[in-house]
A protein has these predicted regions:
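Active-site beta-loop-alpha junctions enriched in small/polar residues
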Residues: 63, 91, 122-126, 152, ...
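Short beta-strand/loop segments at the ligand-binding rim of alpha/beta enzyme cores
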Residues: 113-121
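Conserved N-terminal subdomain of the carbohydrate kinase-like
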Residues: 5-90
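Conserved phosphate/ATP/ADP-binding segment of small-molecule kinases
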Residues: 113, 127-186
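Anion (oxyanion) recognition and catalysis
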Residues: 23, 108-112, 141
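Glycine/threonine-rich flexible loop motifs
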Residues: 92-101, 129, 157-160
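Structural motif
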Residues: 85-87, 118, 148, 181
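Histidine-anchored nucleotide/phosphate-binding helix
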Residues: 1, 103-109
């Protein structure tokens, strides 16, 4: 299966390093947009391993990154017809209001062109509130074919009740998702 990534990277050594890593993973870089602006920067996050009983923690430093400035007019129009499955995470929607708007428009355009929409409800409380996340992702669900959502996110952020099987079946019944995958942490 040929896969590609849609992203925007700074036009500098760091951006080229990331592009080369993408290529090394046998992922097409045809849809990488390069940011030539003086403000160009790569978004990063820092991971600190936890030591029991303290959990691991993540610090996101993605504000004002090149990716956050991605706009629809930077993408070739043929991308929508060429794509069979478009996968996106809710983290993308949480990074920046303008990027959220762009990502939602991309979901609609891929859906209209006949692509399957694969969506990972990867909720991160450090990026946005449960209320905003719930409102945003529930508006996207009607377009989603393949849904990835944890039991914890379903119960807490999305306020679903019932057995895990009932909750997952509810996504299919309510929104028409054809495949729902979940994780259960013990």
């Amino acid at each position: 299966i040929r896969s590609a990534i849609v992203t925007k990277l700074p036009e500098n050594k760091m951006g080229h390093f990331i592009r080369n890593k993408i290529r090394y993973g046998n992922v097409s870089d045809d849809y990488i947009i390069y940011d030539h602006s003086p403000q160009k920067r790569l978004g990063v996050y820092y991971y600190e391993s936890g030591a029991y009983p303290r959990k691991s923690s993540v610090i996101y430093d993605r504000a004002n990154s090149s990716f956050c400035s991605l706009s629809l007019d930077e993408l070739p129009e043929d991308i929508y017809a060429k794509t069979k499955i478009f996968h996106i995470s809710s983290i993308t929607l949480a990074l920046d209001p303008s990027l959220k708007e762009t990502a939602i428009k991309m979901i609609h355009k891929f859906h209209e062109a006949g692509a399957y929409i694969s969506f990972d409800v990867n909720y991160r409380a450090s990026l946005w509130s449960e209320e905003e996340a719930k409102k945003t992702v529930e508006a996207i669900f009607p377009y989603v074919d393949f849904l990835f959502v944890s039991e914890e996110t379903s119960r807490r952020m999305l306020q679903r009740t019932g057995t895990l099987e009932e909750i997952m079946k509810g996504y299919a019944d309510t929104y028409g998702c054809t495949l729902i995958a979940t994780t259960r942490r013990e």
